């Protein structure tokens, strides 16, 4: 019967190892899909086995796109060999050839299967119509006995509990029906003729065993090792039977005994199926209700005859050669047994072997209990592979071992039939097979994966780097463990930075409002100071220019503070984005510059973002105080100066004996602190001093006329001179002193 795309897709998923299947699920959840296709929920994909995963792919994406998506994910996860095999198997040319060759056989087999189902299991058609998922998988994956039937099966199983226990304790107990955990399908004679030249594919375990045999023989001709690859649909524990060439006759005889038991099991299954005992056993609840076991009479007879004829021919030829006087070669016997097993089992034949395969298959109770026990256990353990849990769709059946302990040995029935030497060799091979090839390799040591992380150097290292002198005494941990710790640190820093960002956003509006108030106050003070200065007969023009310059620099300082604030906020956003991107990076990229990134995050504080330079507030406060003081003093000075300097002809006589006091005038002049440098704050005292002539301690009497001359002409002349001198009094002569930083204006 020709395989369909669904079969090839399921076989490909079953070929994946556990960690490869998890990687496939993760890539399936993260890869981009075409338009019109929805993503499968993660909760369904997470715990799905190959069968359920195939059903989900077909349900959500259809047969064609499911195959294309599987090919895309396999290539993305470096499973190129499986991708090529699936591509060749599902190509249009291959499918056309298979459909042309096995179309008639498949149709006849399906009709016969339907006839057996209709006669043996009444009501199964209705169950298949109610189940929407049964149409997705091939007919060999159809499920029977759902719903209330499971409860009745469980009850009947509980009732038969003591009987099953008694059958397990009896050494010669035999099973009631040959129920296995796999579905048995054979090829028709047409398939045999069309595919006579096809050779069964060797599994990965066989290739590794052949390679190890060739290496141990030191360049001699490697013997071809063959195995029975038992495909599994429902349970991940699938067994393989590697047959190696032995040099001892007892072990070869054990292989023949095991082979004969398997042949008896196949014939017993055929007879039980023809007599209708399979359906009866399923109804009693001993077998597995998930899978129907149907065997066509013609195909079963062909398979049995094929096995018997092949065994007779090869065994007769082998024993005849040894009986003619030639030496008895164990290699020939091993090759004969291997050929018998592999020739009798094609890739389409699925044998169901339980945990107690070595028991006599003629015992119905024993086989039934083994099948039920195998069904109840969801996890299987292989002593040769040393793997437990949900294995991929291929494992191994141990037939022989290079040590003295063999699986057929009755002394080793209560323990694992494998020696410590085989365990160590197989453990090394499994580690090599499961080593991740996508991890970055060490730049110093080729073909060494960086699986460790040095805490002192903050960098990933390999095992050889760990043993080097450079990392002696350093704290070294697995990179996964270190990545978890650093991810936790990144998460904490992200939470802190996000809280800081929220705090900054909350205080952003008040800060802007304060800046606007500062600018308004500055502009108001500028206007209030500019008006009195203009009214004081323009003798404060230079003072006004200096003051305006100082205010402009103050405005620029406030603007720089605002720019600094926005710059810090942008840096905070950039740092948050870098940390978010760093958190999603793979482990080996995450650990490259983790120290510098965390240091930047730890040094970022909210005070840097919201902190206003302390000099700005002090300058504004000082400006406010000094401006008010200058306004009052200038007003007083203007009024007093106007009253004191208003010279007229009527006031000359009355003010004849009164001279203006320099100390009094000096007290009326304000002291103003100015900022002349934009980068540094410099306080200057503006002092109006009288210009002293050489040798005099008091200013000359410029403003008062002589009392000796009191004519109107002279009075007019003195009045003009006084006005001229008063104008010269209003002229500024600024001088800057670097020692005391005082600005003095003299006249």
From Swiss-Prot:
One of its GO terms (cellular component) is cytosol. Expressed in spleen and, to a lesser degree in the lung. Not expressed in thymus, testis, ovary, heart, brain, liver, kidney and muscle. Residues 89-181, 698-720 are annotated as: Disordered. One of its GO terms (biological process) is response to type II interferon. It is found in: Cytoplasm, Cytoskeleton; Cell projection, Ruffle; Cell projection, Lamellipodium; Cytoplasm. A zinc finger (B box-type) spans 442-479. Residues 1-92 form the Pyrin domain. The B box-type zinc finger interacts, possibly intramolecularly, with the pyrin domain; this may be an autoinhibitory mechanism released by PSTPIP1 binding. This is Pyrin. It comes from Rattus norvegicus (Rat).
